Amino acid sequence: MAAQPLLRILCLAGFRQSERGFREKTGALRKALRGRAELVCLSGPHPVVDAAGSEGARPDSGPCPPEEQPQGWWFSEQEADVFLALEEPTACRGLEEALETVAQALNKLGPFDGILGFSQGAALAALVCALGQGGDPRFPLPRFVILVSGFCPRGLGLMEPIMQGPLSLPSLHVFGDTDGVIPSQESMQLCSRFDGAVTLTHSGGHFIPAAAPQRQAYLKFLDQFAD
């Protein structure tokens, strides 16, 4: 019997995560989905200069390799390299470059069956799906999307494509009851914009869970896309 082909999933990192750091953060998930899915990690296009103490930051002040440089998808202030998910931004600086980065990855690294996003990456993934459903040729709709600690992006019309109408692709929304960065109600609001959304809650905080109970939920969700 031939082996089941792997589902290919483009994974969008959170804010202040380096490419290497995000690969490490998704290591448990990659192990949980071994033999079922291939995870291709992508970090944002913008270096986050003031990232001391953040995910992926080095303890010294010396230069770090590109794969270890903390990155972001866009910033919520015009001058500062910051992102505040729960506040109305004064700008969405760098967003178009973020969208172009995803478009290039889809074109050059694809095809992909699904998209997974974490935190800011989940907000971007939702926006990409909304733009694709609205006819943006850069973003053909994936077969599914997995949004971990997601939220509706704020500012400069970002929320409108998501709020205009229900998104009609299968979605799994993963969030923690004690997430102090993205409160669960933010993830639930995003979840409400998808038809037939599936939720996976856990008792933890701001991370991608991959223990046995979550593994079964991921596999059950992905089973419907097995060829």
Curated annotation (Swiss-Prot):
GO cellular component entries: cytoplasm; nucleus
Keywords, alphabetical: Hydrolase, Serine esterase
Entry GO MF terms: hydrolase activity
Active site: S119, D179, H206
InterPro entries noted in UniProt: AB_hydrolase_fold, FSH-like_dom, LovG
Reaction equations catalysed: a carboxylic ester + H2O = an alcohol + a carboxylate + H(+)
UniProt keyword Protein transport, yes or no: no
Stored SUPFAM superfamilies: alpha/beta-Hydrolases
Catalytic EC class: hydrolase
Entry EC no(s): 3.1.1.1
PANTHER family assigned: ESTERASE OVCA2 (PTHR48070:SF6)
Main function: Exhibits ester hydrolase activity with a strong preference for long-chain alkyl ester substrates and high selectivity against a variety of short, branched, and substituted esters. Is able to hydrolyze ester bonds within a wide range of p-nitrophenyl derivatives (C2-C14) in vitro, with a strong preference toward substrates of >8 carbons.
Similarity annotation: Belongs to the LovG family.
Name this protein carries in UniProt: Esterase OVCA2
